[in-house]
Amino acid sequence: MWSKEQVLAGSYQELSDCLMDLLKYEMVGIILDDCTIGLVNKMLENTQLMLDNIDEFEWSDVMKVRQSNYTAIRLINTLLINQYDKIFTHKR
């Protein structure tokens, strides 16, 4: 069985990877709302805070944060998929 730390660390890594994807899109000229990047940064901070104080949180808290992170990742991936046309047009 996974520990609370392992679950949150995995969620943190997935969210961090998502932020890197967002930044890569900006490097090729896709303009994203600053709020999107700010939101992911804030979620990373909150997940790290929870990791740093893991003994103060119940499993239900960990799972809520994990689910929130996963939902944000899915929404951002959808946003990025919708930007593919702009990316391929930019590369031509």
Name each region found by the language model.
Residues L19, L23-E26, T47-L51, I73, ...:
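A structural signal for well-ordered alpha-helices, especially hydrophobic packing surfaces
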Residues M27-D34, N53-M63:
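Charged, low-complexity interaction regions
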Residues E14, D21, K42, S68-T71, ...:
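Charged, amphipathic alpha-helical oligomerization/scaffolding segments
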Residues V62-R92:
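Amphipathic alpha-helical binding modules
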Residues L8-L15, C35-Q48:
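Short amphipathic alpha-helical heptad-repeat segments
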Residues M1-V28:
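Short terminal alpha-helical segments
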Residues G10, D17, D52, T71, ...:
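Alpha-helical and His/Cys-centered functional microenvironments
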